[in-house]
Design a protein with these regions (language model features):
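Short cysteine clusters
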Residues: 48, 68-71
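Short helix-to-coil "ATP-lid" hinge immediately C-terminal to the conserved N-box Asn in the Bergerat
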Residues: 74
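Short cysteine/histidine-rich metal-coordination sites, predominantly Zn2+-binding motifs
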Residues: 62-69, 82-91
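N-terminal pre-ligand scaffold of iron-sulfur
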Residues: 1-63, 77, 91-114
Length: 114
């Protein structure tokens, strides 16, 4: 039987402006939260997959993709996968919006194991 995820509130939807990343500290994680122009909300670990990368919250959002701020790597906000020709993956967090609140759940790994 699959364990049910526990979602915790991280803020009001209005705090997450469209196409602008916002950093949230939650349960030992630094998370970059993004709201697309279509209103979808995504959360990724706020760490670039590039060896010399910086915080992802400073990146640019276009559709369901994030462009890493220092090296312009294209990252799928839905999966955390870096798009070709580059390679890598960013840890993504389950997100849900209920009413005017945004909730987040833990990924399948702990920060110490990443």
């Amino acid at each position: 039987m699959k364990e049910r995820k526990v979602f915790d509130p991280i803020g009001a939807l209005e705090q997450f402006l469209p196409q602008i990343g916002r950093t949230v500290n939650w349960n030992g994680w630094e998370i970059a939260v993004f709201r697309t122009s279509a209103g979808e909300v995504f959360a990724l670990e706020n760490r670039s997959p590039h060896p010399k990368g910086g915080p992802l919250a400073e990146g640019m959002v276009s559709g369901c993709f994030l462009y890493e701020p220092l090296h312009d790597w294209k990252i799928d906000l839905r999966t955390g996968l870096v798009q070709l020709p580059d390679q890598g993956q960013v840890l993504s967090f389950p997100v849900k919006v209920e009413g005017d609140q945004v909730y987040i759940a833990a990924p399948d790994v702990h920060p110490a194991s990443t």
